[in-house]
Design a protein with these regions (language model features):
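Generic alpha-helical secondary structure signal
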Residues: 35-38, 80, 120
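Winged helix-turn-helix DNA-binding recognition segment
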Residues: 50-108
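Short recognition helix of helix-turn-helix/winged-helix DNA-binding domains
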Residues: 1-66, 168-178
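Electrostatic interaction modules used in gene-expression and signaling proteins
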Residues: 27-28, 96-101, 105-179
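Charged/polar, solvent-exposed surface patches and flexible loops
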Residues: 39-42, 46, 73, 84, ...
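Sequence-level detector for tyrosine residue identity
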Residues: 18-20, 33, 43, 88, ...
Length: 179
Protein backbone atom coordinates (compact mmCIF):
# COMPACT_ATOMS: atom_id res chain seq x y z
CA UNK A 1 0.00 0.00 0.00
CA UNK A 2 2.88 2.36 0.74
CA UNK A 3 4.33 1.80 -2.74
CA UNK A 4 0.90 2.51 -4.24
CA UNK A 5 0.61 5.74 -2.23
CA UNK A 6 4.10 6.84 -3.27
CA UNK A 7 3.38 6.11 -6.91
CA UNK A 8 0.20 8.20 -6.81
CA UNK A 9 2.13 11.13 -5.32
CA UNK A 10 4.43 10.98 -8.35
CA UNK A 11 1.48 10.64 -10.75
CA UNK A 12 -0.28 13.66 -9.24
CA UNK A 13 2.81 15.86 -9.74
CA UNK A 14 2.30 15.81 -13.51
CA UNK A 15 -0.84 13.82 -14.44
CA UNK A 16 -0.92 14.93 -18.09
CA UNK A 17 2.32 13.00 -18.64
CA UNK A 18 0.50 9.66 -18.22
CA UNK A 19 -1.93 8.68 -20.96
CA UNK A 20 -4.01 6.43 -18.69
CA UNK A 21 -4.90 9.49 -16.57
CA UNK A 22 -6.15 11.50 -19.54
CA UNK A 23 -9.81 11.73 -20.52
CA UNK A 24 -10.97 9.87 -23.66
CA UNK A 25 -10.69 13.15 -25.59
CA UNK A 26 -7.02 13.46 -24.58
CA UNK A 27 -7.49 16.27 -22.06
CA UNK A 28 -6.00 16.13 -18.60
CA UNK A 29 -8.25 15.36 -15.65
CA UNK A 30 -8.64 17.81 -12.77
CA UNK A 31 -6.03 17.29 -10.07
CA UNK A 32 -8.55 17.28 -7.22
CA UNK A 33 -10.56 14.57 -8.96
CA UNK A 34 -7.39 12.53 -9.49
CA UNK A 35 -6.45 13.09 -5.85
CA UNK A 36 -9.84 11.64 -4.85
CA UNK A 37 -9.33 8.69 -7.23
CA UNK A 38 -5.93 8.17 -5.59
CA UNK A 39 -7.56 8.14 -2.12
CA UNK A 40 -10.11 5.56 -3.23
CA UNK A 41 -7.50 3.37 -4.92
CA UNK A 42 -5.23 3.69 -1.87
CA UNK A 43 -8.04 2.45 0.38
CA UNK A 44 -8.88 -0.42 -1.99
CA UNK A 45 -5.24 -1.52 -2.25
CA UNK A 46 -4.87 -1.27 1.54
CA UNK A 47 -7.85 -3.63 1.94
CA UNK A 48 -6.79 -5.90 -0.94
CA UNK A 49 -6.36 -9.64 -0.49
CA UNK A 50 -3.59 -10.12 -3.03
CA UNK A 51 -4.09 -13.81 -3.84
CA UNK A 52 -7.61 -13.33 -5.20
CA UNK A 53 -7.44 -9.55 -5.85
CA UNK A 54 -10.66 -9.14 -3.84
CA UNK A 55 -11.17 -6.13 -1.60
CA UNK A 56 -11.87 -7.24 1.96
CA UNK A 57 -10.48 -9.12 4.93
CA UNK A 58 -9.85 -12.84 5.40
CA UNK A 59 -11.40 -14.17 8.62
CA UNK A 60 -11.77 -17.67 10.03
CA UNK A 61 -15.50 -17.42 9.20
CA UNK A 62 -14.94 -16.52 5.54
CA UNK A 63 -14.04 -13.48 3.50
CA UNK A 64 -15.50 -10.18 4.72
CA UNK A 65 -16.16 -7.94 1.72
CA UNK A 66 -15.90 -4.16 1.89
CA UNK A 67 -18.87 -2.08 0.74
CA UNK A 68 -18.74 1.29 -1.00
CA UNK A 69 -19.93 2.79 2.30
CA UNK A 70 -16.82 1.30 3.96
CA UNK A 71 -14.71 2.93 1.26
CA UNK A 72 -16.44 6.29 1.84
CA UNK A 73 -15.81 6.09 5.60
CA UNK A 74 -12.21 4.97 5.08
CA UNK A 75 -11.39 7.77 2.66
CA UNK A 76 -13.44 10.54 4.25
CA UNK A 77 -15.17 11.16 0.91
CA UNK A 78 -18.95 11.25 0.41
CA UNK A 79 -20.37 8.06 -1.08
CA UNK A 80 -21.43 9.83 -4.30
CA UNK A 81 -17.82 10.97 -4.83
CA UNK A 82 -16.51 7.45 -4.19
CA UNK A 83 -18.89 6.16 -6.87
CA UNK A 84 -17.61 8.80 -9.33
CA UNK A 85 -14.04 7.72 -8.62
CA UNK A 86 -14.99 4.05 -9.00
CA UNK A 87 -16.57 4.78 -12.38
CA UNK A 88 -13.32 6.46 -13.44
CA UNK A 89 -11.34 3.39 -12.33
CA UNK A 90 -13.80 0.96 -13.97
CA UNK A 91 -13.61 2.87 -17.26
CA UNK A 92 -9.83 2.31 -17.22
CA UNK A 93 -10.23 -1.38 -16.42
CA UNK A 94 -8.68 -1.05 -12.96
CA UNK A 95 -11.66 -2.36 -10.94
CA UNK A 96 -14.38 -4.94 -11.45
CA UNK A 97 -17.42 -5.31 -9.24
CA UNK A 98 -19.92 -8.17 -9.38
CA UNK A 99 -23.18 -8.20 -7.45
CA UNK A 100 -24.22 -11.72 -6.38
CA UNK A 101 -27.95 -12.15 -5.84
CA UNK A 102 -29.99 -14.52 -3.73
CA UNK A 103 -33.57 -15.68 -4.21
CA UNK A 104 -35.43 -16.08 -0.93
CA UNK A 105 -39.11 -17.06 -1.17
CA UNK A 106 -39.36 -15.66 -4.69
CA UNK A 107 -37.76 -12.31 -3.85
CA UNK A 108 -34.29 -11.42 -5.10
CA UNK A 109 -31.83 -9.80 -2.73
CA UNK A 110 -28.47 -8.28 -3.61
CA UNK A 111 -25.52 -9.48 -1.57
CA UNK A 112 -22.37 -7.45 -0.93
CA UNK A 113 -20.62 -6.83 -4.24
CA UNK A 114 -17.32 -8.56 -4.92
CA UNK A 115 -14.81 -5.86 -5.83
CA UNK A 116 -11.52 -6.77 -7.45
CA UNK A 117 -8.54 -4.71 -8.49
CA UNK A 118 -7.26 -5.93 -11.84
CA UNK A 119 -3.68 -6.70 -12.85
CA UNK A 120 -4.02 -3.85 -15.37
CA UNK A 121 -4.10 -1.31 -12.53
CA UNK A 122 -0.72 -2.43 -11.21
CA UNK A 123 0.75 -2.56 -14.73
CA UNK A 124 -0.52 0.94 -15.53
CA UNK A 125 0.92 2.57 -12.43
CA UNK A 126 4.18 0.66 -12.70
CA UNK A 127 3.91 -1.63 -9.67
CA UNK A 128 3.50 -4.97 -11.45
CA UNK A 129 6.63 -6.59 -9.97
CA UNK A 130 5.76 -5.47 -6.42
CA UNK A 131 2.21 -6.77 -6.97
CA UNK A 132 3.46 -10.20 -8.08
CA UNK A 133 5.78 -10.40 -5.05
CA UNK A 134 2.93 -9.41 -2.71
CA UNK A 135 0.73 -12.05 -4.33
CA UNK A 136 3.29 -14.78 -3.59
CA UNK A 137 3.73 -13.61 0.00
CA UNK A 138 -0.05 -13.51 0.48
CA UNK A 139 -0.33 -17.12 -0.68
CA UNK A 140 2.16 -18.22 1.97
CA UNK A 141 0.40 -16.21 4.68
CA UNK A 142 -2.98 -17.68 3.72
CA UNK A 143 -1.60 -21.22 3.93
CA UNK A 144 -0.29 -20.46 7.43
CA UNK A 145 -3.66 -19.00 8.44
CA UNK A 146 -5.46 -22.02 7.03
CA UNK A 147 -3.21 -24.38 8.99
CA UNK A 148 -3.50 -22.41 12.24
CA UNK A 149 -7.31 -22.08 12.10
CA UNK A 150 -8.01 -25.53 10.67
CA UNK A 151 -10.25 -23.96 8.03
CA UNK A 152 -9.77 -25.00 4.40
CA UNK A 153 -8.31 -22.22 2.24
CA UNK A 154 -11.33 -22.32 -0.07
CA UNK A 155 -13.64 -21.38 2.81
CA UNK A 156 -11.33 -18.62 4.05
CA UNK A 157 -11.53 -16.94 0.64
CA UNK A 158 -15.28 -17.39 0.03
CA UNK A 159 -17.31 -14.28 0.93
CA UNK A 160 -19.31 -14.75 4.14
CA UNK A 161 -22.59 -13.84 2.43
CA UNK A 162 -22.05 -16.56 -0.16
CA UNK A 163 -21.12 -19.11 2.52
CA UNK A 164 -24.47 -18.38 4.20
CA UNK A 165 -26.25 -18.75 0.87
CA UNK A 166 -24.55 -22.10 0.17
CA UNK A 167 -25.29 -23.34 3.70
CA UNK A 168 -28.96 -22.37 3.37
CA UNK A 169 -29.18 -24.13 0.00
CA UNK A 170 -27.55 -27.28 1.42
CA UNK A 171 -29.97 -27.27 4.36
CA UNK A 172 -32.95 -26.99 2.01
CA UNK A 173 -31.60 -29.80 -0.18
CA UNK A 174 -31.01 -32.07 2.83
CA UNK A 175 -34.45 -31.30 4.26
CA UNK A 176 -36.17 -33.06 1.35
CA UNK A 177 -37.46 -36.39 2.57
CA UNK A 178 -38.45 -39.36 0.50
CA UNK A 179 -41.43 -41.60 1.41
Amino acid sequence: AALNRGRWIKLLDNPSQYDYLLSPSGKSTQRQYLADVARVMDYLVSELEFRTSKVGVVTANGFLLRTWANVARGTGLPEWRVKQCVKYAKDRGWITSKQPRENINGDWYGLASIKRITDKYFRDIGLNLAYLNAKQAATQNLKKLSDSTGVHLRYLLTPITLLRKFARRATQTNAVTFP
